[in-house]
Amino acid sequence: MKQKVLFVLLNGYADWGAFLSTALHVAVIPDGEIKYEVHTVAPTLDTVRPIGGFRTLPDYSFENMPKDYAALVLIGGNRWESPEAELVAPLVKEALDKDKIVRAICNGASFLCSHGFLNHVKHTGNGIDQLKKWGVQFILT
């Protein structure tokens, strides 16, 4: 059975940051088994516009997204400091509480940092100066 991986899309998402979906959606080895289903989720079912301008129609809204997913991926972009992004924090908390995989790219990782989700885990993301702009308090180890 394929596992669902949900990619969170906000308007202004970095479409190149969705590269991970390609690796998950096809078999890594030619003629190999495809283990994942890639789906998109957004605040509503309305069209989402990334930085590159293509229109993306999400599979699910935050209200009707499935509960039986394996991973939640926050794609970077320029709207992670918006009120729209704040709707994602409860989704991340619920995913982590249920021991689901949560991953983020670029400003998605900064969003996780700014909400304290990465306080106790090693992670990569934007540089220290960028994180300070987000108001992130951290300890370097």
PLM regions with names:
Residues 2-14, 18-20, 24-44, 54, ...:
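Active-site-adjacent pocket-lining segments in enzyme domains
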Residues 51:
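A cross-family phosphate/adenosyl-ligand binding-site feature
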